[in-house]
Amino acid sequence: MSKKIITGKVVSNAMDKTITVETDRLTKHPKYHKFVRKTRRYHAHDENNECEIGDIVEIEESRKLSKTKAFVLKRIVRKNILSEEVETPDSVEEELKEAFGGEVDGTTRE
């Protein structure tokens, strides 16, 4: 029997070596025949803690690793572009101090 491979989005990585992956699927309502979006969350093992929130990943079914964890991270399909390091205001202030050679208090001169 082949192992299930599921593609989804990482919504949490707060636990050590564990990620929460959310998948969406469309199902047709039996009575109203309207498509309804269903969401399912899976816990997966991330050995190297390499996933960030927003990454698109593939997880593979494995033996039960804990009470709720039965999948293992197979690969990261696409990294979240927002997980890149963003320039913080502190680093901008330091660059301004270096550029103008003095104290920067955040006020503008006219």
Curated annotation (Swiss-Prot):
Q: Which GO terms describe its cellular component?
A: cytosolic small ribosomal subunit
Q: Name one GO biological process term.
A: translation
Q: Name one Pfam family in it.
A: Ribosomal_S17
Example of a GO MF term? structural constituent of ribosome
Does the keyword field hold RNA-binding?
A: yes
Q: Which UniProt keywords apply?
A: Ribonucleoprotein, Ribosomal protein, RNA-binding, rRNA-binding
Give the multimer and partner information: Part of the 30S ribosomal subunit.
Q: What does this protein do?
A: One of the primary rRNA binding proteins, it binds specifically to the 5'-end of 16S ribosomal RNA.
**Protein family according to the UniProt entry:** Belongs to the universal ribosomal protein uS17 family.
Q: What is this protein called?
A: Small ribosomal subunit protein uS17
Which species is the source of this protein? Answer: Petrotoga mobilis (strain DSM 10674 / SJ95)
Q: What is the lineage of its organism?
A: Bacteria, Thermotogati, Thermotogota, Thermotogae, Petrotogales
Encoding gene per record: rpsQ
